[in-house]
Amino acid sequence: MDQNLFLTKFQFTPQRLMWVGLFMVYLLGLFSPLIENDSAQFAVMAMRMAQENDYLHLIKGFEPYLDKPHMHFWLSALSFELFGFHHWAYRLPSLLMLIVATVSIYRWSNLFYNTQISQWVAFLFASAQTIILSGIDVRTDAVLVGFVSLALYQFSSFIETEKKSALILGSVAAAFAFSTKGQIALLVIGIAILVHLSLRKKWKLLVSHHFLLALFVFSLCISPMLYAYYIQFDQHPELIIRGQGERTGLKFIFWEQSMERLSGEGLGKNSSNYFFFVHSFLWEFLPWTVLFIGGLILTIKRNQQKLSVMEVFPYLVLLIVFPLISMAQFKLPHYLNVLMPLFALATAKFIAYCFHLKKTPKSVKLIQLLILLLYFTLGMFLFFGIFEERVNSFLFVLLLAVSIWSLRAVIHLKFHSFERLLMFNAIGLIFINLILNTSFYPKLAEFQAGYTTAKELKASPYAKSPIYKLTAKHSWALDFYHQRSLKLLKAADLDLFEGLLYVSQEEFDAIKASGKTYDLISKKTQFSVSRLNLKFLNPKTREQVTSYRYLLQLTPSETR
């Protein structure tokens, strides 16, 4: 089938319906309870900013926080100021930045490819599993990828057209990306700029007045973040951060942040495996992983032929950046999110190639259909096989019926077979992620004792009462949903304490053994749901890995 015919047809309802379905995934994800640790932790940090009207200091629990810069927390705190302390308000800035990212990636791709290919680039990015996850398990990555994508588009636009407005907007976006997560943003943006300049042979732009303009705008836009760091850390060398004193915020953001991750000092080493991001990518870019690999193989095979200079652009950037971040001794899967725009751009070329073929390559067709089957099998398992009490049963039946109807409708479309295959996978990923966001994640939240305790307190006389704890161990979910951070009670003051005390199973056993009287306000099941394992997923063995958290009302010993 002629590619132009496909591209014309792709303007019709099927594409629009895929975007609507994908948007529903993100929209419904706004209303799922926050997950500990990072997502709930960052929400509490932003909540403190808004409650205390203190936007200069980053505080994690009872200690100053020197890790991620301020931008994500500022945006979330502003959302709280506007809409109140709700989990959807915390996620809203990240969702908006993912929309910015998607639009920017579309326009960025449109500088080099036609409109239809660019639409696929944007959809591949927005539907990658790790990007969808970043919209519900909100850390700093959604805001980061939004600003990075905007910077990539604007700087590429400047290199292609030399419009000053694009240079200024790119510099602002790069500054905000740097203010969100530090040097990783500049690494990706900087390498992309250098590769683009090299391919277009426009090195003269680096030694022109444009460079000074970009540097000025960038410096101006990072100054609020630098000022906040200076006030909190440079003026207080007595602060002890990760066992070290005399820490300077300015030195940290310009040097130590990346060095700590590369060396594993401070944050610790969690992976020396240089292939960590390779196997992480295999699931993070689902369901399009095979398409990227196909594009990579295609590019290598065509190495001896004449290639468009921008065809190799995303691969060259990835070839430089990917090994650099793989050398870090501290790695987490979501660190790859910032590269997803490049993965999507690289994959779209393979999609265009497949539409030139009369038939879809058998290996690609087989693997993509297996992924589709996996999505529906996993969706059924998540709904029926994990939790005995099922939520949103009607929604599940409706979703399954609509998905089956959509698959049947796609089968009868007179489109290229590869086009139908892509639509199959789009339906599958929307199906599984709607189940995750409307059923699985909300049910997981019921195993966060802090969340369920706070829900119960809202309808009790203790709704606005302060709560104490005996250790600095995190209680982010309770902090956020009670809208008050728990206070620390010294063990020596326990006998004279009067009020609410939130304790672990071990602490409860000790209080009970001491003979101290108490009123049990609540007893809730606790599990670290961000670290799922087979014993938890199996209802028969779940109790082996769960514990309890207790909320007690204590009175002073002398008054009894």
Feature-to-residue mapping (PLM):
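Membrane-interface transmembrane helices that cradle and orient dolichyl/undecaprenyl
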Residues: 9, 111, 115, 151-169, ...
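Transmembrane-helix signature of polytopic, membrane-embedded enzymes
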Residues: 11-20, 105-127
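Extracytosolic helix-loop segments that constitute the early lumenal/periplasmic catalytic or substrate-binding loops
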Residues: 23-25, 41-64, 71-74, 78, ...
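Transmembrane-helix motifs of polytopic, lipid-linked glycan transferases
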Residues: 92-112, 150
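Short acidic/glycine- and proline-prone juxtamembrane loop motifs at membrane-interface regions
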Residues: 130-143
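Membrane-interface alpha helices of multi-pass inner-membrane proteins
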Residues: 133, 166-181, 322-326
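Membrane-embedded architecture of ER/inner-membrane glycosylation machinery
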Residues: 168, 262, 298-560
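Transmembrane-lumen/periplasm boundary regions of multi-pass, lipid-linked membrane glycan transferases
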Residues: 185-334, 339-342, 348-350, 363-370, ...
